[in-house]
UniProtKB/Swiss-Prot annotation:
Purpose of the protein: Catalyzes the dehydration of D-mannonate.
A molecular function GO annotation: ferrous iron binding
S-adenosyl-L-methionine found in the keyword field: no
Disulfide cross-links: none
Protein name: Mannonate dehydratase
Gene: uxuA
Pathway(s) the chain acts in: Carbohydrate metabolism; pentose and glucuronate interconversion
Catalysed reaction equations from the record: D-mannonate = 2-dehydro-3-deoxy-D-gluconate + H2O
Amino acid sequence: MEQTWRWYGPNDPVSLDDIRQAGATGIVNALHHIPNGEVWSKEEILKRKAIIEAKGLTWSVVESVPVHEEIKTQTGNFQQWIDNYKQTLRNLAECGIDTVCYNFMPVLDWTRTDLEFEMPDGSKALRFDQIAFAAFELHILKRPGAEADYTEAEQAQALEYFNNMSEAQIQQLTSNIIAGLPGAEEGYTLEEFQAQLDRYAGISKDKLREHMAYFLSQLMPVCEAHGLKLAVHPDDPPRPILGLPRIVSTIEDIDWLTEKVPSKMNGLTMCTGSYGVRGDNDLVKMIKKHGERIYFTHLRSTKREESNPMTFHEAAHLDGDVDMYNVVMAILDEEQRRAEVGDHRLIPMRPDHGHQMLDDLKKKTNPGYSAIGRLKGLAEVRGLEMALKRAFYTK
């Protein structure tokens, strides 16, 4: 696997020098300063590429080129946004970047209720609390129809949870959910947020699938002409939330996506932390079945909590519910299969997220993206990979 690291650009508190010292060789980056939907010019791409390469690193993967909301709803200027997206892909390819991660999640990117969940060892992790989220939907946002998404027991627990919240806690929970996260342009007031949700009224899972298939059908000729691979990131969490449809959550969703848009340029990001939240997702089976379409991997683990099967926190990389041993073995099997047919390029892998720990507890960090937790995760995965390669792949 190619060892990569997500970098949020010049304003990231983790520097390129830090990243190189961590042992990564590839950078995962995006031009976050360009508004969603606007074309990334070659000038801007090359400027960022030069900054990365000046430190002896390679811009390996773009994560992400954001998909404008009007593309997802097929409203407004969606065709113009698609045309802009195509031009951005052309520009990236002509600048030597050939792998682009993206997602098709409506309104929100990855969603958590707690960005500073304290672990038993004192480190801090990201967490999704089903009851806290229900309290937000039912009693803070007051989304019409939200009751249908929760059991009576969950509704009662959510009311108790809400009644025990201070005003500061209400504001913090709201901010965690709707104010946007690193790499996301969106940040909403409650009223604006509900208005965004309302845009999806009447858009079912099947309809959103139609919109995604149309989007990809428009992009594939550009991707094929330039050898540029798209790698869709799964929904996070991988289930419907806020009354919104989700269409990249299960192996059945991947089956549909690869059958509907069969081009080899229509690929996947295997994010074990996202897919792994669902107990019914067999990650190794997913990798073995769709390995040839995996162009990017995010390796992290989550732990479902006993209090509620929908509640989870982000575990250490080799802990939690993800069987990282067999996941890495399956990825190495795919790399070997490719090598046997002449494709020796390693699959880019980044240690996704990481606990805030040690000296980073005293610093301002991007949620999930502090340096030391990811350094630990990368070192652990690197060691696991080396052991597997020497035991099973050295001839």
